[in-house]
Amino acid sequence: MILCVFLLVVIGLFSVQTTLLEVFSLWGTTPDLALIFAVYCGAHFQRNGGIGAGIIIGFVQDCLSGGLLGINTLSKGLAGLFFSVLKDKIVVEGFIPISFFIFTASLLDGMIYFVISTSLTAAQAKEGILLIRMFAFGIYNSAAGLLLFYLLDKGRQWINHKIPNQVLRPL
């Protein structure tokens, strides 16, 4: 049951990200719903479930992107690992912590993408433009992350209310 809910959310997020979010592009930047969901899984899944969820989300995104295989798997897996470890030490709830942590994860994701793509391919990027775009990416992800965290929390509460047994409690 947990796997079915997880798959439905992942399919929905990738559908929205690939079809609808291009309309809301700012300076060529769109929010990365997969990264936000990896952070959410790391912060809310029990034990180390966020690591596996981040790796699966990143691998699916790598397969759908057609670019270098492994960049998203690494970055989303690291986001899941970071927040799986961090959730026991810091409460990841509220406006400011969620925004800060998603912004940090976005910068980490952008740096991983930049380092791997420039070292493995002949891609070149201007550092000034890259820094501005990464900063815009982080701010845009933070804003979208607040909305997505809210929607995912409401969905989790609704599922736990409708199915009051212990089947979905690890979510």
Task: Please annotate each region the language model reported.
Residues 1-171:
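Terminal, non-globular segments
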